[in-house]
Swiss-Prot record:
Pfam families linked: DUF5376 (PF17346)
The protein, known as: UPF0275 protein PM0505
Family to which this protein belongs: Belongs to the UPF0275 family.
Length: 142
């Protein structure tokens, strides 16, 4: 997957965005990049705790949710979704949960760590040129 980091404006205010640039599975990868974009604003430390957890090989299972998404480190992959049912008993699942919202999306942990590190670097860099963009290829993680 290739991801585009860019700048934009909304109501005359600058913002930073990431989205799928090139993919074999745009639906899966779109959820991954949407989750990625929510990480810095979901944590007091701007996402560095998530990066540390993803890069820590001793962590084999840990929840790394953002405000809008649920995410789970599972050994060598990251599972992302709107509503993951891991660790839930059948009777605990609310009746109004749309089954489509429970479909997990996956990305290899190594690729996600690389992508998150690049995103946090981009996100925390001051905007000096509104036309500046970066294209990140997750295969470069290897």
């Amino acid at each position: 997957m290739k991801v585009l980091f860019s700048y934009g404006t909304y109501n005359n205010r600058p913002y930073k965005a990431c989205g799928v640039y090139e993919s074999d599975n745009r639906e899966n990868d779109g959820v991954i990049t949407d989750y990625l974009s929510t990480i810095p604003d979901s944590y007091a430390d701007n996402g560095f705790k998530v990066l540390a957890a993803v890069k820590d090989p001793t962590i084999t299972r840990e929840w790394i949710d953002s405000q809008a998404f649920e995410a789970l480190i599972e050994h060598d992959q990251i599972k992302v979704g709107f509503y993951l049912l891991d660790d839930m008993e059948e009777e605990d699942i609310p009746d109004d949960v749309d089954e489509r919202d429970t479909d997990p999306r996956f990305i290899p942990r190594k690729e996600f760590a690389y992508l998150l590190e690049k995103w946090l670097d981009f996100y925390h860099r001051p905007i000096t040129d509104m036309n500046y963009q970066e294209i990140i290829d997750t295969k470069d993680a290897y």
